[in-house]
């Protein structure tokens, strides 16, 4: 592997390598050839230290956007101004000392011309961006007077909160479930609008492995013989993790990338497997079939650590001991509630009889006789039946992956040592994302690549998490009152219908006011034209943010939140490292901006709920930290402040080590007998699709075989950008030197057929909307597949917006926005 990689590198550089450059540079320096670099000190005056230079202070900081990395920053301040940022240092984890261009350019965000400087009131047409300056007293008074009026007339659920993820900190953030904004919502009894993003893939892990972290820690990376990055470009979207893979590759492991385009991480891989968009689940099923065909499945692991031996009756329910005449018992769960205990049955080959699964010596996974009058099948039999149609030929036809590559993947996952899989959210962003993710999970289980060092998934570095959410939300007032709780849940896909119709599930449900913080929903949610209509239909909108982004333009009242470096806070929601991070206040808030924490408390006071917010920042943070892990380890905010970071290894290095999962049976699950949708909008649901992990169906629009592709032949991947997190950093001008404007990467053969050349303006369109951008010819693109960086504001596009081409409908049972499941046609302008 090493020789092959070195040979390819030599070819790519025509023999000119970093080592040869260094040797050549050394030789040239020795002969004086590098004149501009050689020492010439004879004519230089001795430099004297600058007198009276301002002292540089370094403060602890954290990058708090929702890229998920949670990078630790040193914030350099001189004369009360932020002058630079550098990577912070973890004494007990230097492998996480990382900073990216976004972290390095934070000072430009602090001093951005786009900063909201003072509270403002809309004076023009909504969306036109015409505002007048008002005072904080006026802003809080107008907001709370309106809210009280709506509550008196329509009830507290007429006010809807959207908790954004643009500031993932406990005091000022929206997204952390126990944030102060979430507490304000609970105290008021308002409605909560769920963003419904990035749900499908994590939900697949919960369904099959149980709740909580499902991935191995970074320390386990060196134990893998192969690393498979499936459905993403970690070099852009997961910078904290990427260097571990590259170091492991350099140490001898194989790096495999399965993706829909040849991107940065694919260029670093030993083996790149291109797959048609949204067909990853089909590929996994084809690989499973080949494994079973070759009898390579991990029989002992499947028998002992999964529910593969469990028996399913013809009615789709588990065969349980009660079916054999054994009365169920009861037990008390962790919440103090009584639960019925009726164990699932397996056929014990040693005993030659049906027994409770926990009592079996050797559970059967093949044919099982009729038991107590019930015809049954093992889950393993069902897996074999489900993958039978996925022959090498059929799988290759659907996915575009060659039969040889499918066979190679089957061999790699079962015959070539430990395989660790990093399943990225590329799979998540399609309407069939939940099914594709479960199919890949099934592959890992059938191959036995779970629960041991060097195997399993990467799902984010296990860490402290979001803290004691319930304690934060249910903290009584100073008079002993308890918060009302969330008044109602509204899914994003249903929000426009609820607002425009005044009904929810056929019942009256007026929503009049909308409050969003730390978010840019107009740019970041799907089907932008509908979002704009929603914003116009609402009576009263309050937006709290740092900048004049696309959503700010639609506000009735704008509240200026200060930058992260202008206040103190605790970074809690992140996936890139195992640390709690303390963000010190480095400078005073600029202009009239205020910390989000302070704004939430002002709104609470104005609403008459001040008694619920009579706590200091430290008191609230200590409540957040009072989890069982926090209590056991004596974690307080003062302890975090000792070094401004605190390592929290809340999970073992290897998830499910020894094959012990977090499900009720302690086994990994392939089947759920009574699944339920995770949202309710009155939709029709075929629950048969949701029961079994081997169910797969094509994507709604991205699938090549969909008839819609005759009218709209291209699909768009709206990918992450290096220089932005969602739309944050849009206001950093020198980042635009790297990604200056919206572009569309298109395969040169597709471009030639349409008469498109590099730099041409092209219009992507469908029945929902359109966007105009510049064409970039890229041979790394598959035919009929486009890639467009997705973090530009609407006003940065030539015309339209990528978000206008997407749809806002969910999978029947999974509340997940499908950013990539989008078909368009192309017009050259």
What are these regions (language model features)?
Residues 2-300, 304-364, 375-376, 393, ...:
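N-terminal export/assembly segments and adjacent metallocofactor-ligating motifs
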Residues 2-5, 175-257, 282, 350-351, ...:
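Extended redox/cofactor-interaction regions of prokaryotic respiratory oxidoreductases
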Residues 118, 122-138, 296-403, 586-671, ...:
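N-terminal leader/propeptide and maturation segments of large enzyme subunits in energy/redox metabolism
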Residues 140-159, 217-225, 386-387, 407-420, ...:
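Glycine-rich phosphate/diphosphate-binding loops that line cofactor/substrate pockets in enzymes
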Residues 162-171, 233, 394-401, 424-431, ...:
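Conserved short loop/turn motifs at secondary-structure junctions
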Residues 264, 549-582:
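Flexible glycine/proline-rich, aromatic-decorated loop/lid segments
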Residues 269-275, 566, 579-589:
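Short beta-alpha connecting loops at secondary-structure transitions
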Residues 596-640, 727-745, 749-829:
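Long, contiguous, secondary-structure-rich segments that constitute the structural scaffold
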